[in-house]
A protein has these predicted regions:
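Conserved acyl-donor/pantetheine-binding loop and adjacent beta-alpha core of acyl/acetyltransferases
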Residues: 51-76
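Conserved catalytic-core motifs of GNAT/GCN5-like acyltransferases
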Residues: 129-143
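Conserved acetyl-CoA-binding loop-helix of GNAT-fold acetyltransferases
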Residues: 83-102, 125
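A short helix-loop-beta-strand connector motif used in the catalytic cores of GNAT acetyltransferases and
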Residues: 29-50, 55-58
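Short amphipathic alpha-helix that is part of the acyltransferase structural core
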Residues: 1-31, 41
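Conserved beta-strand-loop-alpha-helix junction that forms the acyl-donor binding cleft
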Residues: 110-121, 136-139
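Short, aromatic/basic amphipathic alpha-helical patches
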Residues: 121-129
Length: 149
């Protein structure tokens, strides 16, 4: 049904994030810095089905100002996700978790989500636990179980 997730380069990320309904105010040029901030996407037949923006930070942000100011670290923060096709939002979150688990030494995977019922339902239905409720956002945490041989 879908291809594997792909990581967007700077130019494609700029184009994709022009349509970000969750965090439209974030600067386009801020979203991609190698090994720090990444944009992933799913597509089918050259059509974008979903997009997920991730920043690897040294703290858990509760608002956009903190998101923009925190430094590089080992907490992967999913700060924006949107989809154009049913089921692709779930797929990109779970597939990106698997990818990051295999590629990074990060030890926490959290969101900075809008404080909406939709965000609450989406993340809890996908296995995340509410970490904290903030004035404008929720932080959810996805627990990753590492398999050792």
């Amino acid at each position: 049904m879908w291809n594997d997730i792909e990581k967007a380069g700077v130019e494609l990320a700029d184009e994709l994030c022009k349509h970000d309904p969750v965090r439209p105010n974030l600067p386009q040029h801020w979203r991609v810095v190698p090994n720090w901030r990444e944009v992933f996407y799913l597509k089918t037949n050259h059509m974008i089905d979903s997009v997920l923006c991730v920043a690897h930070l040294d703290g858990i942000p509760i608002n956009e100002d903190e998101l923009l100011s925190f430094g590089n670290g080992n907490i992967s923060v999913f700060y924006s996700v949107w989809s154009n096709k049913k089921g692709s939002g779930r797929k990109i979150v779970l597939d990106t978790l698997d990818l990051l688990k295999s590629q990074h030494s990060n030890n926490r995977y959290v969101t900075m989500s809008p404080k909406t019922e939709m965000a609450m339902k989406f993340h809890t239905d996908n296995g995340a636990k509410l970490l904290q409720e903030n004035p404008l956002t929720y932080n959810f945490e996805y627990t990753i179980i590492f398999e050792y041989e």
